[in-house]
UniProtKB/Swiss-Prot annotation:
Organism: Listeria monocytogenes serotype 4b (strain F2365)
EC number of this enzyme: 6.1.1.6
HAMAP family: Lys_tRNA_synth_class2 (MF_00252)
Full protein name: Lysine--tRNA ligase
Cellular location(s): Cytoplasm
BP-aspect Gene Ontology terms: lysyl-tRNA aminoacylation
Ligand binding (Mg(2+) 2): E415
Subunit structure: Homodimer.
Co-factor(s): Mg(2+)
Entry's transmembrane regions: none
A GO MF label: lysine-tRNA ligase activity
């Protein structure tokens, strides 16, 4: 921005503050009080759309509306303004002789961005525009800063994220997206409730960072003089509830991971996790398929959507494929017949798949999948049979114990859900935790730690259980065609300005 523009902005700030002083000298509060609205601009739009000019004149319908000034024209003793409320605009016709000299003087001082209240009657102009003829004018809040240019809005994407309030005022698409986010959350809860799940709340502060492979945020509790972790998953507390006899539970809550940011990652994000006793991962596939397709139909009116360049059909029944079969299909490498870690490493070297010291057969299979397959799964696909090495909380597959009864859901090349038949053998679970701790010693800083309290809970008996985790933010991105996670978080985490 040039120095000239800086001066212009400063001048506007000064002039608006001078108007505040002028109003106060006249005994008028520039930041008014409660204003009772009888109707919104949107309701006027829909309720009176079919009424003629003559019908409205005869009815003389009195209303009370409020909104933000988006346009203003004054010519002598007459003025026009458009007010906006949730992106529905309404024209207001203001005459000096109708609202009084004092109120008209206040109107003349009003700026774009000011919030006003109007009482008056509905009429239709000669051009056919529904409007309100003001009989009373009230200044409700003086805007001390000018809004972004109405024709260009906020073009700086980073400014949209940092100043979401301006984005919501000037960008209807953005506001609609957040309305849809709220609806997606509501419909998700409705679906889970209708399936017999009970919504619960579990702690955000954990004594051990468990339930996922991720780096935690660490804090300190002064009174107890102990380190605590912001939760990286909801899982381990919810499974304790299944032990306690709460057969079907779910939680929608924030989780925190001290990792990088991208178009798909934010350090804090929203997860849905659910657990159902006496079920397995195949039951959870059915749950996910029903949930996502139902919510999509409710918010979009169809299960066929567009995401970026892709046309996606979320209509059940979705494809289901074992991870080893997916790698064989897309890469041509048959991990079913790989018999040793050394053979897996040789294949990785041949196909330019990066490996580190702690990686064994299962890690390498997963690396093949993530490198060559994941991004190609555009239509909804359940990939199941994850290796045991990367699934420390999942039940081993009884036919091939190299794999687990786990799946991930991929749509447009991205993971949207993770689920498994929960590991309920406390002895096996302890051994998995110990293996994870060895990995940590070898350099895998995302490996699980030992959770003795969770192991003790398992020893009382966890019934066979199907567990699920869905990233709500990615689901919202998918259903609203949002290119970045920052587009569907009201206030995404941002680096400090320089």
């Amino acid at each position: 921005m040039s120095n000239e523009n800086h001066e212009e902005l400063n001048d506007q700030l000064i002039v608006r503050r001078e108007k505040v002083d002028t109003l106060r000298e006249e005994g008028i509060d520039p930041f008014g009080e409660k204003f009772i609205r009888s109707i919104s601009p949107e309701e006027i739009e829909t309720k009176f759309a079919d009424k003629s000019k003559e019908e409205l004149e005869e009815a003389a319908i009195e209303v009370s509306v409020a909104g933000r000034i988006m346009t203003k024209r004054v010519k002598g003793k007459v003025g026009f303004t458009h007010i906006q409320d949730r992106f529905h605009q309404l024209q207001i016709y203001i005459r000096k002789d109708a609202i009084g000299e004092d109120a008209y003087a206040v109107f003349k001082l009003a700026d774009l961005g000011d919030i006003i209240g109007i009482k008056g009657t509905i009429f239709r102009t000669n051009t056919g525009e529904l409007s309100v003829k003001a009989t009373e004018f009230t200044l409700l809040s003086k805007s001390l800063r000018p809004l972004p240019d109405k024709y260009h809005g906020l073009k700086d994407v980073e400014q949209r994220y940092r100043q979401r309030y301006l984005d919501l005022i000037t960008n209807e698409e953005s506001q609609n997206r957040f309305v849809m986010r709220s609806k997606i959350l509501k419909y998700t809860r409705d679906y889970m409730d209708n399936q017999g799940f009970l919504e619960v709340e579990t702690p955000v502060l954990h004594t051990i960072a468990g339930g996922a492979a991720a780096k935690p945020f660490i804090t300190h509790h002064n009174a107890l003089d102990m380190e605590l972790y912001l939760r990286i998953a909801l899982e381990l507390h919810l499974k304790r509830l299944i032990v306690g006899g709460m057969d079907k539970v779910y939680e929608i809550g924030r989780v925190f991971r001290n990792e990088g940011t991208s178009t798909r990652h934010n350090p804090e994000f929203t997860m849905l996790e659910s657990y159902a006793a006496y079920e397995d991962y195949e039951d959870v596939m059915d749950l996910v398929e029903g949930l996502v397709s139902t919510v999509c139909k409710q918010v979009n009116g169809t299960t066929e959507i567009t995401y970026g360049e892709y046309n996606v059909d979320l209509t059940p029944n979705w494809r289901r494929i074992h991870m080893a079969d997916a790698v064989k299909e897309y890469v041509g490498v048959d991990f079913w017949n790989v018999t040793s870690d050394e053979e897996a490493r040789e294949l990785a070297k041949k196909h330019n798949v990066p490996v580190t010291e702690h990686m064994t057969y299962g890690h390498i299979l997963n690396e093949f999948f993530e490198t060559y397959v994941e991004e190609k799964l555009i239509q909804p696909t359940f990939v199941y049979g994850h290796p045991v090495e990367i699934s420390p909380l999942a039940k081993k597959n009884k036919e091939d114990d190299r794999f687990t009864d786990r799946f991930e859901l991929f749509i447009v090349g991205r993971e949207h859900a993770n689920a498994f038949s929960e590991l309920n053998d406390p002895i096996d679970q302890r051994e998995r935790f110990e293996a994870q701790m060895k990995e940590r010693e070898q350099g895998n800083d995302e490996a699980h730690g030992m959770d003795a309290d969770f192991l003790e809970a398992l020893e009382y008996g966890l019934p066979p259980t199907g567990g699920l985790g869905i990233g709500i933010d990615r689901l919202v991105m998918l259903l609203t065609d949002a290119p970045s996670i920052r587009d569907i978080l009201l206030f995404p985490t941002m680096k400090h300005r320089d």
